């Protein structure tokens, strides 16, 4: 499959929504076209980096670990050299001590240099923190100890039916490992999304962007999180009508 085919379908983004109700008088103004385009571009570039990494190393990214297997840096650091735009992450990647923890004397100052692709477009967050997270748990992309390949996912639920990254309800330090959302298909999902325009977003592994409504069906979203559950998600149960996308 060509990169153009993988990323041909990219939905219009508007931002993210908090799971808790927004207090009256605190609603943000409607997103501008520029903000929508920027949010779309961030997630598109992130998924391109995922596939570039997979093409180079044979599996999707995961947290970087030390010689004993202990995670020391997030996958967000690992994919820096694989962003399509020249120099988008190469120079920053070279600054990291890849054999040291995220909060070491060398690596901790680099938290402040978080790339724009991880920054919220409209939602406030502390410097160096991102809402873009994956799911870690049984059957999810970032299941600990698993190296997921695109061929495995394509032969199971399919990349178009599987979520890679989602806008989470809580931000995390972008370089910190083991910072993805704990996932157990038998337990309720945590709050997802942040305060924008009544929806939040997820990037599917085919590169398309899914808009998710506030009152999404939880079981349908869980089906989209697993890579080999055998389900074809009913997108209408979690995504707003086409006219509102």
Where are these regions (language model features)?
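Boundary at the C-terminal end of the N-terminal hydrophobic targeting segment
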Residues: 18-25
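Internal low-complexity, small-residue/proline-rich segments
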Residues: 26-245
């Amino acid at each position: 499959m060509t990169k153009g085919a993988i990323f041909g379908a990219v939905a219009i983004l508007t931002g993210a929504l908090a799971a808790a109700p927004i207090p009256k008088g605190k609603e943000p103004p409607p997103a501008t076209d520029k903000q929508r385009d920027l949010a779309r571009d961030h997630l598109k570039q992130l998924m391109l980096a995922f596939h570039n990494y997979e093409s180079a190393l044979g599996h999707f990214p995961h947290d970087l670990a030390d010689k004993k297997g202990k995670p020391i840096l997030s996958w967000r650091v690992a994919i820096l050299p694989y962003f399509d735009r020249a120099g988008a992450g190469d120079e920053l990647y070279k600054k990291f001590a890849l054999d040291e923890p995220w909060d070491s004397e060398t690596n901790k100052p680099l938290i402040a240099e978080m790339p724009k692709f991880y920054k919220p477009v409209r939602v406030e967050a502390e410097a160096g923190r991102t809402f873009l997270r994956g799911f870690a748990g049984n059957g999810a992309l970032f299941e600990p100890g698993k190296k997921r390949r695109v061929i495995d996912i394509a032969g199971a639920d399919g990349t178009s039916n599987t979520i890679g990254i989602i806008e989470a309800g809580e931000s995390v330090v972008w370089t910190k490992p083991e910072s993805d959302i704990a996932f157990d298909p038998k337990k309720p999902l945590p709050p997802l999304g942040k305060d924008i325009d009544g929806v939040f977003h997820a990037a599917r592994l085919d590169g398309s962007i899914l808009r998710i409504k506030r009152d999404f069906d939880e079981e349908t979203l869980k089906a989209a999180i697993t890579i080999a559950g055998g389900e074809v998600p009913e997108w209408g149960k979690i995504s707003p009508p086409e006219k509102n996308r």
